[in-house]
């Protein structure tokens, strides 16, 4: 029988990292726990890893504290919004909206969602001096405590606490804010997962260096420049762009080339091709399309070379018949008009003769006016895949119109919202139609809305997880005037409206709750008898404890929790774990549990977790002895955990 109290671990700025070293390189520690550096160097040299003598790092006031924050356990619990989640359109949804501090939410997610997130897109505060970013921290450390836990001297601890408690918008404060969030986010990413971070010039340089430290410089995919505005303000340089920094968990696991099937121009050409092919044939088909192409060519970039059409659609000529880099196949192709062999590519053809004969029979080869032009291969618009350009031209004001469609009653529901088109493009390049897309700075809810749209239009199966702080809307704002008191309320309403426009995909809602197990000694009085009464849980506390435990034990928030009747006692089964939280677990309930293990072929728990505060010591021992000594017919070994 194992006893544990979750979220009670005493962590330091380096304790988790040290534990990883001890687990993977035990030979590098002596019997007293001292690290033997030379042993690790031997392992590295034996693996023929080159040792660099040059290095640099980014340091700031609060870095040790930021690392400590990344390691500390959450100080909250997670609760389900049952009323919302049980609605017909939401009850089977895999999408999640979570209310609360995103650092706390990420900490809760680690056990269940580690290495499961395909893509992260975040739009954190830019720290412009005008966006309202101020670092606030409600953790209550004394200088002495922080000095010990973060491994810093007392003077530095005092200076850190000064800016964390009084509020600051310095570079150091912003880095202290963003570091632990990115650190935990990396743990959630799949090996082939990517993270896209929107930022502007104010923190771009700092963010790049801190990402190098967290994700590894070798896993930097690139930086995108988003040209999203026109700046007519009097200045030396008109600032008309933002940045999107891109990193991956493991670049060796990333596909070598990103291409996207999503293109508005492609869709236009495919539709025009189908329309014209249904109306015209032969020379008239090409003549009509040529006329249309000349009129619209300026709108067709990057497909403004697709000037031909046949019954199969609109196409262009490609020199992909050339063999790249080495000697290819040699044979003659006769020009249909001059009856002479066509000029061959310098290195020959890339296809063998039988493949070329098939392409010729299918009329997929383009000939020039005579034999002096090298043949080309027909490449159809319907097969076009777009590459991700490092420069994105997309008017940021489009987001205002997107929101106006959802909130016609409001002039400006959100400020500085990102456009659906931007996030849609990023997802289409980095993902392949499935996986979890995470946004822990939900804001206007653009990422979640984009996932709804993609799943509806392209029949993809993405799931979003999006997190938003319960932040008040501004006084006299459009949102406040329409009854939305918090950003979360408005984000949730956007997702409700967006879901209705996209096959009612729905979403589930969860929220952080104060940890009711945490007690403050200053609250202890003789009249406050419930201070001692840990066994009395309200229905909300009961459900919150169950939700938090299931997530802590590795179950996704969308995993069903099944009620189990044990002779009138209600237990809960989730992913093979049986939870006993309610009081009054009787001998009859224990007997019913053992009988169910034997007789119910679908009931095969591997662990029993019970709430220690609701089980007297004698009952704990009875349960432990019964499970250890009972030889059930399925030969199941049941682990027993007493949890508080």
Swiss-Prot record:
The lineage of its organism: Bacteria, Pseudomonadati, Pseudomonadota, Gammaproteobacteria, Enterobacterales. This R-M system is also called EcoP15. Keywords: DNA-binding, Methyltransferase, Plasmid, Restriction system, S-adenosyl-L-methionine, Transferase. PROSITE patterns: N6_MTASE. Residues 123-126 are annotated as: Binding of S-adenosyl methionine. InterPro entries: DNA_methylase_N4/N6, DNA_methylase_N6_adenine_CS, N4/N6-MTase_EcoPI_Mod-like, SAM-dependent_MTases_sf, T3RM_EcoP15I_C. The keyword Kinase does not apply. Belongs to the N(4)/N(6)-methyltransferase family. It catalyses: a 2'-deoxyadenosine in DNA + S-adenosyl-L-methionine = an N(6)-methyl-2'-deoxyadenosine in DNA + S-adenosyl-L-homocysteine + H(+). Forms a homodimer capable of methylating the target sequence in the absence of Res. A heterotetramer with stoichiometry Res(2)Mod(2). A heterotrimer with stoichiometry Res(1)Mod(2). One of its GO terms (molecular function) is DNA binding. The gene is mod. DNA restriction requires both the Res and Mod subunits. Coiled coil: none annotated. Its EC number is 2.1.1.72. GO terms for biological process: DNA restriction-modification system; methylation. This is Type III restriction-modification enzyme EcoP15I Mod subunit.
